[in-house]
């Protein structure tokens, strides 16, 4: 059922399709998830619960935590450029009341850990308020597909510059972070993350993978 949403998109996936793919009854589905929105919330919890871990593996342990943030947000933006169905899911996640609240709560804890040294007087509650703004920026950039004028590279640099400014990262350090991201093959990384995500979802929620994802 989760693969159906990830490969077809949120708005085009019906409850009937989810139930059929999951091979469960309507009553069982309603007891577990209540509605299609319940599936979205569970999907968001799973995806956002592991995104920082994936980014940490790519950035490595030797780099400051701000690099993990830059990699994680860059992967999100790259994923939405590679797969329109993932764009649909991410946009819905950042708009849906319960799903977006989970994102704010989960991400604000990470932001407090990462950017607390830059804003020592800020509490985790302050970072929650900042996350509402940065999540709005993320959704805005996700909703605008890249083209030959507004490339993915420009999108990443613009988003990171705005968000790192909001979190009081010094200009010299910002440049180092942006240079690091520019040297990554972020598209290839996003493809790898997408494949690993689908495989992890298959293991977590017990659905078969098509050959295109197994490869």
Residue ranges and their predicted role:
Residues 3-7, 50, 54, 79, ...:
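Solvent-exposed, amphipathic alpha-helical segments
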Residues 4, 8-38, 42:
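Helix-turn-helix
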Residues 42, 53-88, 94-96, 104-109:
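Hydrophobic alpha-helical connector segments
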Residues 9-10, 52, 56-60, 88, ...:
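Short, flexible helix-adjacent loops and helix caps
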């Amino acid at each position: 059922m989760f693969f159906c949403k990830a490969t077809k998109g949120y708005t085009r996936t019906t409850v009937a399709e989810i139930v059929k793919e999951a091979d469960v009854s309507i009553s069982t589905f309603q007891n577990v998830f209540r509605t299609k929105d319940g599936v979205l919330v569970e999907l968001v919890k799973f995806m956002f619960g592991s995104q920082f871990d994936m980014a940490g593996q790519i950035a490595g342990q030797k780099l400051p935590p701000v690099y993990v943030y830059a990699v994680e947000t860059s992967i999100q933006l790259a994923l939405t450029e590679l797969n329109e169905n993932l764009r649909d899911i991410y946009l819905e996640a950042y708009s849906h009341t319960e799903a977006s609240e989970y994102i704010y709560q989960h991400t604000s804890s990470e932001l407090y850990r990462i950017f607390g040294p830059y804003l020592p007087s800020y509490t985790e509650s302050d970072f929650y308020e900042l996350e509402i703004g940065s999540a709005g920026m993320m959704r805005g950039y996700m909703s605008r597909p890249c083209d030959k004028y507004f490339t993915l590279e420009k999108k990443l640099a613009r988003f990171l510059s705005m968000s790192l400014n909001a979190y009081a990262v010094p200009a010299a350090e910002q440049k180092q972070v942006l240079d690091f991201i520019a040297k990554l093959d972020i598209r290839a990384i996003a493809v790898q993350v997408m494949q690993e995500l689908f495989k992890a979802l298959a293991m977590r929620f017990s659905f078969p993978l098509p050959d295109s994802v197994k490869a």
